[in-house]
Regions:
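Intrinsically disordered, low-complexity Pro/Gly/Ser/Thr-rich segments with frequent PxxP/GP/PP motifs
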Residues: 58-89, 95
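Short edge beta-strand/loop segments characteristic of extracellular beta-sandwich folds
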Residues: 35-39
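A generic structural signal for short beta-strands and their flanking turns/coil linkers
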Residues: 32-34, 47, 66, 88, ...
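Glycine-rich nucleotide phosphate-binding loop and flanking beta-alpha elements
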Residues: 44, 84, 98
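C-terminal interaction-tip segments
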Residues: 1-31, 41, 94-115
Length: 115
């Protein structure tokens, strides 16, 4: 079995759809997400982010975190391992800002792939 370290990055949007897919494990790949860093670059609005994964190869999502608060100009770190099986998806999206301004959130994940 080969092990490969991967990095994934995402400009986080507000839609709970495929545009929020940060990482998808390949068809014959198992993956361990070591950590997720979610940064709110907005100097005014608190960000609320949602983190979900599939457990069945990409169709049924379950929340790891719902409306997790990231303070202004700050970073939230999820540092416990998340195991993904082949075709599983890691998705991140934000709740819209109350003043209707654009969210300014970035996310980064450190991932170990095993194939």
């Amino acid at each position: 079995m080969a092990s490969t370290f991967k990095n994934a990055g995402l400009d986080v949007g507000v839609l709970d759809d495929s545009t929020g897919n940060m990482y998808t494990a390949g068809g014959s790949v198992y993956a361990v997400v070591h950590a997720i860093y979610i940064s709110n670059e907005n100097a005014t609005n608190l960000a609320k982010v949602n983190v979900k994964v599939t457990t069945d190869g990409g169709s049924t999502f379950y929340h790891i975190g719902r409306s997790l608060e990231v303070d202004v100009n700050n970073t939230l770190v999820l540092d416990k391992p998340i195991n993904l099986e082949p075709n599983d998806i890691l998705r991140i999206y934000a709740d819209p800002n109350p003043d209707s301004s654009s969210v300014d959130v970035e996310a980064y994940a450190s991932i170990l792939e095993i194939s």
